[in-house]
Amino acid sequence: MVKLFIGNLPREATEQEIRSLFEQYGKVLECDIIKNYGFVHIEDKTAAEDAIRNLHHYKLHGVNINVEASKNKSKTSTKLHVGNISPTCTNKELRAKFEEYGPVIECDIVKDYAFVHMERAEDAVEAIRGLDNTEFQGKRMHVQLSTSRLRTAPGMGDQSGCYRCGKEGHWSKECPIDRSGRVADLTEQYNEQYGAVRTPYTMSYGDSLYYNNAYGALDAYYKRCRAARSYEAVAAAAASVYNYAEQTLSQLPQVQNTAMASHLTSTSLDPYDRHLLPTSGAAATAAAAAAAAAAVTAASTSYYGRDRSPLRRATAPVPTVGEGYGYGHESELSQASAAARNSLYDMARYEREQYADRARYSAF
């Protein structure tokens, strides 16, 4: 019986269709499809070779399928990692290169690196010696033993096989080889430099030997700062500020506080009325004198004090012709004449109804 691998299968392909396709060259014992690839078991080796020769790159539902003999990897094979491969290199060319040193069971290219499985370990060692750091298709490739394995748990590996060094008998997290590929030796150097290895965290923070000895001064400073920032200190500061405010308010004059309180509590005052605050002594006398002077100045102003509305203002009396005028009354006569002229002009100007002619002018 020969097992064949069928790759790049279309979604429309069925097991019955694949079986009937391979039965043209021999008896098919088994046919299995797994996603986009499958396996076919043919009884005769000659029939299997004919199927590979005729069905490889056969177009099925518009897709070229791949047919080749299935390669069972031997348990004793040696896996090599080949890095820095040319992007134009193919599996067949890389396989032929390594077959110069021994039989190759499997060859897989992944981007710019590949994995080559060789049947014998001595052939793999010879391939490393002969091909590592050599030119192949214009690029210098690197060949070394592969340390990658299938991990049973993330970051753990397996006791039966470490994925870092490939050896058995220890977990991957306990491997002496670190991630960079170097052997880590942290037993004696760590103990000599830092003393005893730290025990698990059984004590609370701050009580451990590793914090108090090294950071004693810092711990004392932290305690002082914490005491200064305590709740009692903040409360005392707030109380002192409150006492200072009360003492300052108590020093204000009692009379001023009483007058202000009466002014604020009075309900008969106009909210828009502006009054001067009560003062005492010379300040009150000066304020009264200033108010009286302002009143006299306003009364003596003829232009701004005069009401210019003809409706609210009374007409000034016009002197008669029979009245005589003596020396010293020219100023009074001139003032009366000016008042008469202004009043007559204003009356002639504002006597007519302002809104009577609105209808006549609204048409324009």
From Swiss-Prot:
A zinc finger (CCHC-type) spans 160-177. There is a cross-link at K79, K92 (Glycyl lysine isopeptide (Lys-Gly) (interchain with G-Cter in SUMO2)). The keyword Zinc-finger applies. This is RNA-binding protein 4. Gene3D superfamilies: 3.30.70.330, Zinc finger, CCHC-type. Pfam families: RRM_1 (PF00076), zf-CCHC (PF00098). The gene is RBM4. It comes from Homo sapiens (Human). It comes from the Eukaryota. Residues 196-364 are annotated as: Interaction with TNPO3. RNA-binding factor involved in multiple aspects of cellular processes like alternative splicing of pre-mRNA and translation regulation. Modulates alternative 5'-splice site and exon selection. Acts as a muscle cell differentiation-promoting factor. Activates exon skipping of the PTB pre-mRNA during muscle cell differentiation. Antagonizes the activity of the splicing factor PTBP1 to modulate muscle cell-specific exon selection of alpha tropomyosin. Binds to intronic pyrimidine-rich sequence of the TPM1 and MAPT pre-mRNAs.
